[in-house]
């Protein structure tokens, strides 16, 4: 195959559907449930995923496997069911409740337990962080929707003729397939990142599942969309989409840097423009190149890129506190809505990330307790984010918006928001009687051992309501003071007393 230098090429993957045979599954006893086995084939030019391969010449090949799970809605479209592929029966098996009559079905793939349905809208994960097993394709984000089906006078899971219901699935995404060479055989690929100028991933993706059994499949009616905003554990809005997709590897499966195959499921787009592929090794060496795609990327198609690129020592990590160019002057704490958005770029892959907190209000034991506030919420003054001290700390860190170890290790780009923790700091500082400083120092180390440090500085300034101007005149028997009057004050009075006396004047 001709090597592609500047353009993604379209591989017409002319694939045969996975023609499954069906064996009757005995019904479970009790509960009124009927054991059902659904069949599922893929529309032409797609393949029945799971065990799937791209040979960069003929396209996709593969079969369903025992890890594949189908999301099914049957009559009660508010109840999402999960059917798991069984290799013995070559069908997706599960249970339906009901008797013979009219049965209407909707289905999608995959349903790994995190999907939800509201009406005809399905929400599934479409994460920026993905894992491959070596050079094998990962089917977790290969989203498909089935044509709607309705059968009258039929038993659950059957056609009127008594055959198993078969879903015809349509792939919603496009597949970008990268074959990369040029690194040292002695090094392992730590991660491969795809970067676009527009969002290409999100914690949540929504699409419309077909609902009219008489309608021809219309890709434009599926309307897949990336969800832009979510809510943090502290209740504040956070961004959940990303312009990056990063692939890392299951333990012990990372391919050698001299040859790797990486796959990215993305949504169709009329013109992605610049697409950058960046790879790094476990030794901190990196390779990167950009291609330009100005023609449409279409659902159901595989687009392949083959490249030999030099791997050289990566640039040191950079850490950015977004919106804060001056890191020497502390930022005044607000009552709420404090911003703490952090962007980390590590071309060599992150090996470790530590945060050190210096704050008297967070680290001093609370009144009537031996614990300080950090300890009370399962945190500590010094924490290794890539290896939290215990499960409680790991859960607490995630709750406050810190990235998890999986979101850090070998990643080349990390974005996180910890404004909720800073809002908690502001709540505590509302009670202080003197100016208080709090520092959050982040230390990022990449796979090459290069370190970058950044400190987020916050201050709660407490202004005295009355300040002596240090201008006493003993001869004139006078002195002056400056009052700091709140803007919402309705009346102001000043009292004084002579030293040694108890009466205020």
Enumerate the language-model features and the residues they cover.
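Short helix-loop boundary/capping segments
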Residues: 160, 168, 179-257
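A short beta-strand micro-motif common to beta-rich folds, especially ectodomain repeats
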Residues: 436-447
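Acidic/polar, low-complexity intrinsically disordered N-terminal segments immediately downstream
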Residues: 22-85, 301-375, 379-380, 462-489
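Short, low-hydrophobicity acidic/polar segments
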Residues: 23-188, 248-249, 257, 278, ...
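C-terminal motif of bacterial Sec signal peptides marking the signal peptidase cleavage site
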Residues: 16-18
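Conserved structural position at the C-terminal beta-strand
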Residues: 109, 279-281, 444-446
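Recognizes extended acidic, P/S/T-rich segments that occur
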Residues: 497-505
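C-terminal edge beta-strand
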Residues: 451-460
